[in-house]
Regions:
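Conserved "HGTGT" condensation-loop signature of ketosynthase/thiolase-family condensing enzymes
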Residues: 1-76, 95-99, 106-125
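Active-site nucleophile and cofactor-binding loops and adjacent substrate-binding regions
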Residues: 76-86
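Conserved phosphate-binding catalytic cores of ATP/NTP-utilizing and phosphoryl-transfer enzymes
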Residues: 87-95
Length: 125
């Protein structure tokens, strides 16, 4: 079994209403994480995208984000488990590395709830 470690972390600005797109939001955190790890997108051999589409009006963001971040043609997985999406994504990345299927996996968790009104957000919880 391969050893696993989190080697870089990043986070976009935490604001009430992010002014950019979902791609830009994820890129901000991704850029910080790969810088923290001393990696480039080319060093990553798989990615896990984690979100809840009910809140950000983006039904299937995995492929779009992987392409935007320069992670293609590597495998990209999509995890959707509402509030636990990112922790579920970390578990998937752990399994991918311990199994030997992949060596370096980026986990990209995001939520942009400002795309819908507060009342809509509460209805969807």
């Amino acid at each position: 079994m391969n050893k696993v470690a989190i080697i870089g972390v990043g986070q976009s600005k935490f604001v009430r209403q992010y002014p950019g797109s979902i791609r830009e939001l994820v890129f901000d955190g991704f850029r910080e994480a790969v810088g923290d790890a001393g990696l480039t997108a080319g060093d990553i051999d798989a990615s896990v995208v984690c979100s809840a589409p009910e809140y950000d009006k983006q039904r299937s963001p995995a492929g779009v984000l992987a392409e935007y971040l320069g992670l293609n043609p590597q495998p990209t997985f999509y995890v959707e488990s509402l509030c636990s999406s990112s922790s579920t994504g970390l578990r998937l990345a752990y399994a991918l590395v311990t199994s030997g299927l992949h060596s370096v996996v980026a986990v990209l968790g995001f939520q942009k709830m400002s795309e819908i009104s507060s009342s809509e957000s509460q209805e969807r919880m």
